Amino acid sequence: ASTYSWTADNVNITVRGYDGGVGNRYILLYRVNCITGVTTLVGNYQHGGISGWTTDSYTQTDEGIYYYYAVSTDNDWHSIQGNTRRVYLDHSDPVIIGVENTNTEWTNVAPSIAVRSTDYLMGTVTVGSGLRSVKIYNDKENLVAAGSNQASYTLRETDEGERTFVIEATDNVGHISRSSVTTRYDITPPGIDGTEITFVRDGIVVSGYMQDNIMDQHIDDEIVRSVHGANKSSGIKSVIVYKVTGTKEEVIYLDTTYHQFVSPDTHSFFDVYYDINQTEDAVDYYLIITRDFAGNQTKKKLTSQRTLLTMFRTSIDRGAY
C-alpha cells in the first residue's frame, strides 16, 4: 500500500484485516500529511462483526507526501494498528521561469535566452519529484541548449531574423511544461543601390560620382541582403540626405531626400531622388545615412560634377563623364 519513489499516478491504499475470533467491528483509516503534519480520517469501514478476512481500499488523488495507519476494532473492542510506508504523489507540472526576461524587440545585439525551472508541489514550497531536464529548441526543432534545472542560449548569426524558441521542462515523473519566446535579431545593414560610378583621373579614384548630377538611389532592408539566411528583417527606420561642406552637415528636407518610418516592416523601402542641376549646390559632397529598426546603419558618400571641378581645377562639362 505504498510507493518507494515519486509517482504521477493516483495511489491505491488497500487495507486487509483478519479476525478469526469474535469478528471485526470496523476499521478506521487515517492519513498523515508529512508536509503539514495534519492527520485526517479518510476511511471508516464498518464490518458488523464478521469473522475472517476483510478488504477495504482508498485512492489517494491529492498530490503530496503521506503515510497511513489503520486501526481495526473487534466486537470485544480490542484494537490493533498497522502503518504504511510513505506515499510520494506528484501531479504538478514544472514551472518555467525567465522567459519573460528575453529581449523580443528588434536588436543587432545577440539576444540571450536564460531560463530555469522549479517543481514545487501545488501551493507549497516542497519540491516534488524534481527536475529531470530543461531544454531549449530552435525553430527548426533542433536542441540548442540543455541542463538539469536550467539552460541558456545566446543567438548566433544563423539565428538572424524572427525566430521562435521553445523551452521544455520535464520532471522526474514525466510531467512536461513548455513555453516559447520569439526573438528579433537583425545584424544586416540596409542597402543603398544607385546609378553612381567610379571616376578615375590622373591616378585619383573618386567613388560615388554622379555623372549626370542626379542623385537616384534605392534603399531597402530586404532579407536577400543577409548572408546568414535571415527570414525577416527589422526594416528601414530612417533615410536622411545631407549636404556636406567642410565639417558642416545640412539636412535636405525634401519628400525624396528625408523620411522617417513609423514601425518595423521587412519590405519597407525608399527611393532617394535629388537633381543637383536644379540647385547648383556648392558643396563638397552628399551623404546618405539610413538606419534600420535594429540599429544597423549604412552610409554612402556621393560626389557631383562641381566636386570634381574643384578637385581637379579644370572645366568639366555636364554629362561629359
Model segments located where?
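Short, solvent-exposed loop/linker segments at the N-terminal edge
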Residues: 2-9, 103-109, 198-205, 321
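Solvent-exposed loop/turn segments flanking beta-strands in beta-repeat/beta-sandwich domains
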Residues: 17-33, 119-138, 212-245
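Short beta-strand segments within Ig-like beta-sandwich modules, predominantly Fibronectin type-III
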Residues: 43-51, 142-149, 261-266
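Surface-exposed, short loops/turns at beta-strand junctions within beta-sandwich domains
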Residues: 58-65, 154-162, 273-283
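Hydrophobic beta-strand segments within extracellular beta-sandwich modules
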Residues: 68, 165, 286-288
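Conserved structural position at the C-terminal beta-strand
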Residues: 72, 169, 289-290
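Short, exposed coil/turn segments at beta-strand boundaries within extracellular/luminal domains
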Residues: 76-81, 172-178, 293-299
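Flexible, low-complexity linkers/stalks enriched in Thr/Pro that connect modular domains
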Residues: 83-94, 171, 181-190, 292, ...
